[in-house]
Amino acid sequence: METLAATAHPDRFADRHLGPREAEIEAMLEAVGYASLDALSDAAVPEAIQLRRPLDLPDALSEAELLATLRGLSEENVEARSFIGMGYHGTVLPPVIQRNVLENPGWYTQYTPYQAEIAQGRLEALLNFQTVVSDLCGLPIANASLLDEGTAAAEAMSLFSGAHRGKRSRFVVDARCHPQTVAVVRMRAEPLGIAVDVTEAREATLGDDLIGVLVQYPTTDGEIVDYADLADRVHAVKGYVAAATDLLALTLIEAPGTWGADVALGSSQRFGVPMGYGGPHAAFFATTEKFARKIPGRIIGLSQDRHGAPALRMALQTREQHIRREKATSNICTAQVLLANIAGFYAVYHGPDGLTAIAEYVHGLTARLAAGLRAAGHAVAHDAFFDTLRVAPAGESGEGLVARAQEQHDINLRLYANGDVGVALDETVTDADLADLLDVFGGDLSEAEAEPGAGAMARTTDFLTHPTFSAYRSETEMLRYLKRLENKDLSLAHAMIPLGSCTMKLNATAEMMPVTFPGFAGLHPFAPLSQAEGYEEVLGSLEEWLGEITGFDAVSLQPNSGAMGEYTGLLTIRAYHAAQGDDRDVCLIPTSAHGTNPASAVMAGMTVVAVKVDDDGNVDLADLKARAEEHAPRLAALMITYPSTHGVFETTIQEMADVVHDAGGLVYMDGANLNAQVGLCRPGDFGMDVCHLNLHKTFAIPHGGGGPGMGPIGVVEKLAPFLPGHPVVPTGGEEAIGPVAAAPYGSALISLISWAYIAMMGPDGLKRASQIAILNANYMAKRLDGHYDVLYRGPSGLSAHEFILDVRPFQKAGVSAEDIAKRLIDYGFHAPTMSWPVAGTLMIEPTESEGKAELDRFCDAMIAIRTEIQEIELGQADAEDNVLNNAPHTLAEVSADDWTHAYPRSQAGFPTPEAAAHKVWPSVGRVDNAYGDRNLVCSCPPMEAYA
């Protein structure tokens, strides 16, 4: 019988992901002067580094095949009941939040809210989150989230060290902090020369070398400890106290700020966010007024717009890495906005009474469990607890009991090194679960009666008294509140977001769906590996695929942001040099680099030396050679972005690598611009030694309004032994550095999105995506050239996947880059990246997901704005009262009874037919950032502000 060839389904995902249709591709190629996509990419990418073979990846799956495959893999994971605790808990995500936030592109596709006028919805949501954290922690200032609890603790240590100007060297960590937190803090401390003393903090010797103390409250084994005396002793020697804590517990126990903590931090995961095998979850960080201008991460604050109305925006940005660079307080860039929003909405949904009721429910179950365990003859270590018990089993080893619980009941418990067993309860636990737990210990539910209570540490202060947390008790009201906030924000559901260096591509629905599969979402990160076989297959194959795409020999998925990828990559370089017996600590960084580069280098214990950039935007090769020669004995690394931050494939990239290698250093490549490389060239082939990959850029994880992100690193073979390890789950190389994230695989849950993207695009689709990204950028540059000056192009006259418009000449007419950015809002667009990497410019990156019609719509808007600028230049428009200076215009302003401007309402609010038909109106006028920084308000304002 004749064998039939396999038939591919005609509906290919790549055709859905890529914006332009074939006829549009041909038209754009003709406009830029190339006959084919291959001819275009051959001209853009230096010949010496081009990949001359297809990527060795599996053939593309259809969306249906992808979903079936991942559902099958999710079912290979065992959905056991995990009572392990250690900062990860079962939780109930309210369906109204799951459907309308987590699964809603109106919430997950935006970028960080740099354009506040079209981001008031998520800014309010983040202010809610900050208010929750501030109220529960009893501290006046909270940020808009950090990456995870471990890194938040490390940030607290760095904050305290900075307060002492680096003159103190000892940081005490209480031995009953979560082990992963201890390990992350130790890793952060070592390059900074800080000695970490892990001990019983209340018995530690405190002297004038003390930076501060970190405690867990309640402790990792569940005890509620009164740390007031410790705080007094620490403050007496001018040290500081950080408390890693639990938001749900804080509804019942005294706020850390009340007993003297200077910082309270932790994970908000149990406020509705699935465990997801470790992340992503929003960490929180609250502190005193003293540290308001040094706190790491983003802060949302209240200001006013040009009409004097209340308006929200990101506050105190001048302290951040993109401005302060190596002097920044932190390298934190992306945070966990989507997860912070979910946690904040969870608090809004339940309100203070509902949260307290949940906490009392959990604590009541725990008290009953403790009574039942004691009745069965077991020793429960502590009398004061919230949700976690430490048990010394009677008549059986802890190891045997834990194994039996897994085998007979699919129950996961924590095993301590001394044989004790840990049990942590949560809001998902039922009486049936309690009965099963007691059965494991040989107890009986009928004997599990006790009177719960927080004892001496019972909370005495109110929280969440703002009306927002009591106004939306019905689902109808909650739904409408979520929708009202969503409608204030521009997302990819409305228009392209052409932010340069941000790669705002499609986040396809099929890629997102597996995130909520129970077999993936419900897994505890410290569950036995035998229960995570589906995850192990996904994570293992993703590492292999990323290695093939980049040309590297090994990959670590642990870093949970691009900035942490930078930090991790530099730590592996540092560890390699140390293993060779070399004392190398100089990191060369071009002056055009993103601010996270120098900030990460300093965190990794390196000294930053700047390298000049020439007039064409390329690294000055002569200056690189001079700096490499000057610092050769101490040269650790060069950090380079490729294509460059100016959007150019530099032809000398291999020569740069040779210069550094010849001087004994290694080359770190910032992978922010990898979207122009996939399938066309591979960093590992042209001399790069380590590179981080922004999975939230190139590989389709959504930006979430400012997180989550994921920044895995790829390394050459000699660096593989130093990939980061973990104290609980074996990961990393033979000589692994310490962990850089709390969970062994970082934000494992969202790695599914990148796995799905690669699996559905296949090798041909991935290459075509890079080619169309380059085509779209060059087509737009061609259309705008002549209206604006396009800075920096390669030898062939082409940009890579992004390009820079010079708008500095318009300053003579009183028009700034900000004016153009705000005027674009009136046309229905989010602005490009503003004043980076060159002040007074706009950097545009369209990505491969936008079709020609949208590119033309944006170009038409930019050309129309150029005409408006010309009217000012020619005196045809008022120098002060003009559409640019007053942009953006709100619907309330345009429809008001009074109109006093020198231009018509139609020009203000309806500059094009498309803008008249559909756009996101700004809900506030231009925000006064300076006013907000002078008058810092970072929690929910009075209700009048929402009017």
Where are these regions (language model features)?
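Core active-site phosphate/anionic-ligand binding loop and the adjoining beta-turn-alpha structural block
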Residues: R270-F271, P280-H350, L638, H696-A769, ...
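A conserved hydrophobic secondary-structure block that centers on an alpha-helix together
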Residues: V132-G150, K167, F171
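Non-catalytic terminal extensions of PLP-dependent enzymes
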Residues: E2-A31, A43-F83, V92-Y108, Y114-E117, ...
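Conserved PLP-enzyme active-site core in the AAT-like
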Residues: G121, T151-A311, L373, G377, ...
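N-terminal export/assembly segments and adjacent metallocofactor-ligating motifs
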Residues: T112-R122, N128-Q130, N143-L147
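Conserved phosphate/anionic-ligand binding catalytic regions in large, soluble enzymes, centered on
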Residues: V273-A286, K290-F291, A335-L339, A424, ...
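General small-molecule cofactor/ligand-binding pocket signal
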Residues: A142, A195-T199, A381, R414, ...
